[in-house]
Amino acid sequence: MSGLSGPPARRGPFPLALLLLFLLGPRLVLAISFHLPINSRKCLREEIHKDLLVTGAYEISDQSGGAGGLRSHLKITDSAGHILYSKEDATKGKFAFTTEDYDMFEVCFESKGTGRIPDQLVILDMKHGVEAKNYEEIAKVEKLKPLEVELRRLEDLSESIVNDFAYMKKREEEMRDTNESTNTRVLYFSIFSMFCLIGLATWQVFYLRRFFKAKKLIE
């Protein structure tokens, strides 16, 4: 029995529309929250590309009611220990800086006090790159229409993706060069070891031959 046949089904524009909606729509950024016990230190680390704007907002709740001299300290550093942002008695605020190189950045919260004090609740919302740009402010300054703002956002996002791929390609080339260099060194070391073993074996043969001749065990 032959089944009914008809024209092949055509895919609608839903996937493309969904992709455009994801790219053009506001990006969802979730804040990080954690509890900070008294006299403790917690740090968050993140790798960020060079020449990127990094912004953040933080809030540290104080449930001690001012008891125990509770103080909180926020410090942001790079891998070399350079301080990019520091705030004593931090409770709530914002920070911003621009990265000079691809690096590992560390955001540290430290709590100091005395007595039995409840843990502090720390909320951190950190953005970088396209997420950190204030497109509403850009639209006001440059007098852009809503569609132009979304196109600007898409352009920046596309540029960010291209830069990410370029960096990944560069890292892949560096890793390949490192592997080739390591393989070459291993090959040279293996050849050197082989010659050393051959030389040692030859020396042992001549040494044993002279020893046995001295003992008159062989002619």
UniProtKB/Swiss-Prot annotation:
Subunit structure: Predominantly dimeric and to a lesser extent monomeric in the ER. Monomer and dimer in ERGIC and cis-Golgi network. Forms homooligomer (via GOLD domain); the assembly is promoted by direct binding with leaderless cargos and may form a protein channel that facilitates cargo entry into the ERGIC. Forms heterooligomeric complexes with other members of the p24 family such as TMED2, TMED7 and TMED9.
Chain residue ranges for the region called Interaction with COPG1: 204-219
Similarity annotation: Belongs to the EMP24/GP25L family.
Side of membrane Lumenal, spans: 32-185
Lineage of the organism: Eukaryota, Metazoa, Chordata, Craniata, Vertebrata
Region feature Required for interaction with STX17, mapped onto this chain: 1-142
Region of interest called Interaction with ARF1 and IL1B, as start-end residue ranges on this chain: 207-219
Keyword Mitochondrion attached: no
Motif COPI vesicle coat-binding per record, residues: 211-219
Membrane topology term: Single-pass type I membrane protein
Region (Required for TMED10 and TMED2 cis-Golgi network localization): 147-178
Transmembrane intervals: 186-206
Function as written in the Swiss-Prot or TrEMBL entry: Cargo receptor involved in protein vesicular trafficking and quality control in the endoplasmic reticulum (ER) and Golgi. The p24 protein family is a group of transmembrane proteins that bind coat protein complex I/COPI and coat protein complex II/COPII involved in vesicular trafficking between the membranes. Acts at the lumenal side for incorporation of secretory cargo molecules into transport vesicles and involved in vesicle coat formation at the cytoplasmic side.
Predominant place of localization: endoplasmic reticulum
Residues glycosylated per entry: N179
GO MF term set: protein transmembrane transporter activity; syntaxin binding
Keyword annotations from UniProtKB, A to Z: Cell membrane, Cytoplasmic vesicle, Endoplasmic reticulum, ER-Golgi transport, Glycoprotein, Golgi apparatus, Membrane, Methylation, Protein transport, Signal, Transmembrane, Transmembrane helix, Transport
Compartments (UniProt record): Endoplasmic reticulum membrane; Endoplasmic reticulum-Golgi intermediate compartment membrane; Golgi apparatus membrane; Golgi apparatus, cis-Golgi network membrane
Protein's name according to its UniProt entry: Transmembrane emp24 domain-containing protein 10
Ranges where the GOLD domain occurs: 41-193
